[in-house]
């Protein structure tokens, strides 16, 4: 445990040459979601977080896919305790954080739904968020939410600063993505879209334009931004089986290049003030989450 704490101290003391401000209390929360499962959402979350880390940012990944948390498997790490242990008071937040790289860490989720009881408990939540200083130097936290439009998933999305919806060209995925866009437009003026598993870039653009047209006809105030397409990669399935991050192992693969472009577009939106994001930290995020779960 002491070794883990020491590694975490090193993680938090890393100087970020690409940040020109004191980011304490200014962590930005990027939620990744989808209208249905099986569209590659969690792999995108993990690879996007790694790409942001490679750009020089300090990044956390929060596995908020309640009931199906599996980012530890995707990253190829073993976690003995997760956020449920922290919320129950059985471990400190510092003890559950798993370092992936110096500057990239995982906040592991729980694969059951017991976590909801503790997130909704004010006393447990207050004790948990009082330890937020351990993550206060992170520039970004990527929140991998569940698929669909369930109440718990929506609470995480509403509490985040930026919502990215992942879809594929499959008709059922597009239909579910629109449902996701529609419900999230009630709380977000701007949403972002990634077209995954496309045969070629123009298929991704066509998927976006189809969704954009329907959304604009029914949700006049919505801004739906296209982050880009990710083509099918012959290497992805291999490295998923091997529990390795493709962006790390094969940075020149088309998948990795697309992830880097998407990360760059997101950063340009979030760092130039195109999106109005208040200064906040993990405590603010969880307090908003509690409000939406209420």
Swiss-Prot record:
Give this protein's Gene Ontology molecular function annotations.
Answer: ATP binding; ATP hydrolysis activity
Report the CDD domains cross-referenced here: FlhG-like (cd02038)
Is ATP-binding included in the keywords of this UniProt record?
yes
Keyword annotations for this protein, in alphabetical order, are: ATP-binding, Bacterial flagellum biogenesis, Nucleotide-binding
Q: What happens when the gene is disrupted?
A: Non-motile, has no flagella, and has reduced expression of FlaA.
* One of the record's GO cellular component terms: cytosol
Q: Which sites bind ATP?
A: 35-42
Q: Which domain of life is it from?
A: Bacteria
What sections of the sequence does the record tag as coiled-coil? none
Q: Which GO terms describe its biological process?
A: bacterial-type flagellum organization
Q: Which Pfam families match?
A: ParA
Does the UniProt entry include the keyword ATP-binding? yes
Homology family? Belongs to the ParA family.
Question: What job does the chain carry out?
Answer: Involved in the placement and assembly of flagella.
Please give the name of this protein.
Flagellum site-determining protein YlxH
**What organism does this protein naturally occur in?**
Helicobacter pylori (strain ATCC 700392 / 26695)
